[in-house]
UniProtKB/Swiss-Prot annotation:
The chain crosses the membrane at residues 80-99. This is Protein ElaB. It is a single-pass membrane protein. InterPro entries: DUF883_C, DUF883_N, YqjD/ElaB. The modification N6-acetyllysine is found at residue 35. Upon overexpression binds to ribosomes. The gene is elaB. One of its GO terms (cellular component) is plasma membrane. It is found in: Cell inner membrane.
């Protein structure tokens, strides 16, 4: 299983790459220049690949979050008093942290 912080960094990098490629594709260049045409084609292909990867990563995050919600729901139904205790503890910690500000 991959690290959530690493996944986030990868998503940020892919988003930045996507934005950069879109900017390059919008920029002016001599369409008659063969290198420009080749570069534009490669950039469009790379942009499509990046968009697919970002979409897949987004789907993966959604699936993992949904699974975590189901596990938490099952846990609370199996052990309601422990769930209440955890909720109270989290609320207490958040209250203390917010009160310090």
């Amino acid at each position: 299983m991959s690290n959530q912080f690493g996944d986030t960094r990868i998503d940020d990098d892919l988003t930045l790459l996507s934005e950069t490629l879109e900017e390059v594709l919008r920029s002016s260049g001599d369409p008659a220049d063969q290198k420009y045409v080749e570069l534009k084609a490669r950039a469009e292909k790379a942009l499509d690949d990046v968009k697919k990867r970002v979409s897949q990563a987004s789907d993966s995050y959604y699936y993992r979050a949904k699974q975590a919600v189901y596990r938490a729901d099952d846990y609370v139904h199996e052990k309601p008093w422990q769930g209440i205790g955890v909720g109270a503890a989290v609320g207490l910690v958040l209250g203390l942290l917010l009160a310090r500000r």
